[in-house]
Amino acid sequence: MIPIKTPVGEFKVWIKRFGTNPKIKVLLLHGGPAMTHEYMECFETFFQREGFEFYEYDQLGSYYSDQPKDSSLWTIDRFVDEVEQVRKAINADKDNFYVLGNSWGGILAMEYALKYQQNMKGLLVSNMMASAPEYGKYADEVLAKQMKPEILKEIRDLEAKKDFENPRYMELLLPNFYKEHLCRLNEWPDGLNRASKHVNGEIYTLMQGPSEFGISGRLAKWDIKNRLHEITIPTLMIGAKYDTMDPKAMEEQSKLVKKGRYLYCPNGSHLAMWDDQKVFMNGVIQFINDVNDEKVN
């Protein structure tokens, strides 16, 4: 556990280090907001094999970290400040610090880079568009239309009534949306099941909304697409065919940053780290090694 200073006091966050490598330190930022590191345990085998030093970490408010009740804490800026405190605690710097964020973790990683890229060696954005309104539009105009009309209608009716506690809501979303676009494995991995069970629903709903189907919480208007050109460090943008995020938008983002590379996962979804694992991990490892060897420009 490491201490984090916030405007409303000091709290502790859970972090676990693997390996020792003064040249490569990777911090993993989970999604949600307020999921847990557990669904990112799949990096362990691959990163340890490469000899990377890396960190699993539960952001403040998540299951293994302190969970203060003050809702003023759940803002992007406050989370960015937290990541900077974590960086200092693990003694990472511009010569070795890589941030890999998935989903909400991708929002946090991009925002962190916009403020603190002078302290980073590389940025990896896994399955997160740089515009929440465009993500919402993709959910409405592309993904929703792939559902059977009667199922979509029932989901929309429940949403209109704000009846999110109704078990039917997840009953509909799980097979028709989550299994199509979140993780396509027939059997969901243990780590993902644990993370889903441990999500802090209060923070998730406040920031994201009631589900992964679009976005309606505090993050709904978030958009930094027109600022991506400010990111000058080597950056990997990862998209996947079946993702909740438009893979074409992910590719475009790789061109908007100064030193971008695009990784496409043809069999993957939002958690391509699980359902297109070989392509995903090979691409991520290749990128980190290339940045380390100064091959990304």
From Swiss-Prot:
Catalytic reaction list: Release of N-terminal proline from a peptide
A GO term, aspect molecular function: aminopeptidase activity
GO CC field: membrane
Gene Ontology BP terms: proteolysis
Keyword Hydrolase: yes
UniProt subunit comment: Monomer.
Name used for this protein in its record: Proline iminopeptidase
Taxonomic classification: Bacteria, Pseudomonadati, Bacteroidota, Flavobacteriia, Flavobacteriales
